[in-house]
């Protein structure tokens, strides 16, 4: 408040492990000229931060989650813990609309979109070509540093939109990305980003099948989920089932997930009919069937029978365990009165926890989660993000 009253320019530094609600402070203070999110860099974080602030290093990180304007903008904001009055059970009702998929599909404007991140320089991103090779799409993208002072790196992101049908899908999905090397002012780099056909598929829970529906799939190019331009349209001529799977974890009770309203569906349909799409190049894309569960099993047994036998032995041991013995797999190895940061790890001191050792006698070891010591080794590159 003091700096705002004195009209002093301020750089807001966030040393937090997740999104922070900033809308109110940004609306009330007009002297915040920049925000630097350093995300808990570790003991050398101060040196890395100083290099960025002094211009010795150029930030090139991107947000790996959407930052909402208000906490209430998240779809399950009132569902967790005591907020809905049920302390015994948590239901995750987002379904396919997780993160940016929810904000895009339901028309919620975020404070900072998924994939967002600024630099001290600027870039031009241009699609130079697209080639379909068997079961993948090969895109060629040119990135040019259009600034005149700082070298920098940029992250190219490719998203796909889907044909609007009775089968519910999110509006768009990240299907590929790549980061450039350090580009000097005026320098250009060509990136090749390959998109596997399964990344364009949707999962049918009723038939347990990965499918691609007939229709137009738009490929959008940019540097965050809200700054995109259509680069190509893929025309899929027929409905295709790419992969048939077996159900292994069926729902034990009905789960009511959120769904698009008819009004929102119509808005998404109209958006894909805009005149500007008429100028976008179109390509015919014919996906191919990948495999069935029986084919996968036959391949494994044919190529590595011993592995299959070991796998069956492990499964048989796990099947003998009671539900009470398996429940710790859900919450990991924790102890009362022990901090979850820095002292919760058993195998690696300094780690922030680990999974359960409930299956160690079956040959399945516990896994160490986020380790603070690993942050120290990567503190310099952590400001780069992706």
Each model region followed by its residue ranges:
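Extracellular and select intracellular beta-sandwich modules with Ser/Thr-enriched
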Residues: 227-232
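Short, hydrophobic/aromatic beta-strand segments
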Residues: 150-158, 170, 203-206
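A short helix->loop->beta-strand "cap" motif at the edges of active sites that frequently abuts
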Residues: 5-10, 30-33
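Short, surface-exposed ligand- or partner-binding patches at beta-edge/loop junctions that are enriched
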Residues: 194-225
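Intrinsically disordered, low-complexity Pro/Gly/Ser/Thr-rich segments with frequent PxxP/GP/PP motifs
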Residues: 166-205
């Amino acid at each position: 408040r003091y700096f705002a009253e004195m009209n002093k320019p301020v750089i807001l530094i966030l040393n937090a492990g997740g999104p922070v609600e900033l809308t109110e402070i940004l609306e009330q203070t007009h002297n915040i000229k920049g925000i630097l999110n350093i995300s808990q860099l570790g003991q050398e974080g101060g040196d890395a931060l100083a290099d960025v602030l002094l211009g010795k290093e150029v930030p090139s990180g991107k947000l790996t989650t959407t930052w909402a304007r208000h906490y209430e903008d998240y779809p399950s904001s009132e569902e967790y813990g005591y907020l809905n009055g049920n302390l015994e059970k948590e239901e995750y009702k987002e379904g396919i609309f997780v993160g940016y998929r929810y904000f895009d599909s339901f028309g919620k404007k975020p404070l900072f979109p998924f994939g967002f991140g600024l630099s001290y320089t600027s870039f031009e991103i241009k699609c130079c070509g697209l080639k379909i090779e068997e079961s993948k799409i090969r895109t060629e993208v040119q990135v040019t540093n259009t600034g005149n002072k700082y070298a920098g790196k940029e992250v190219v992101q490719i998203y796909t939109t889907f044909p609007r049908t009775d089968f519910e899908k999110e509006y768009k999905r990240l299907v590929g990305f790549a980061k450039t090397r350090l580009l000097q002012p005026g320098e250009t780099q060509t990136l090749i980003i390959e998109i596997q056909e399964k990344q364009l598929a949707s999962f049918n829970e009723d038939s347990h099948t990965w499918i691609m529906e007939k229709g137009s799939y738009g490929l959008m190019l940019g540097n965050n989920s809200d700054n995109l331009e259509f680069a190509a349209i893929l025309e899929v001529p027929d409905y295709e089932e790419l992969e048939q799977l077996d159900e292994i974890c069926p729902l034990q009770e009905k789960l009511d997930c959120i769904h698009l309203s008819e009004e929102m569906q119509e808005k998404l349909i109209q958006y894909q009919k805009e005149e500007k799409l008429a100028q976008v190049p179109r390509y015919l894309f014919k996906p191919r069937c990948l495999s069935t569960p029986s084919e996968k099993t036959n391949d494994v047994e044919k190529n590595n029978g011993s592995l299959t036998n070991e796998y069956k032995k492990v499964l048989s041991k796990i099947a003998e365990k009671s539900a009470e013995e398996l429940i710790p797999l859900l919450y990991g190895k924790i102890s009362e009165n022990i901090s979850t940061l820095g002292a919760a790890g058993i195998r690696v001191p300094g780690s922030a926890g680990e999974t359960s050792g409930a299956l160690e006698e079956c040959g399945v070891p516990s896994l160490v989660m986020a380790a603070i010591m690993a942050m120290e080794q990567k503190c310099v590159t952590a400001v780069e993000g992706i």
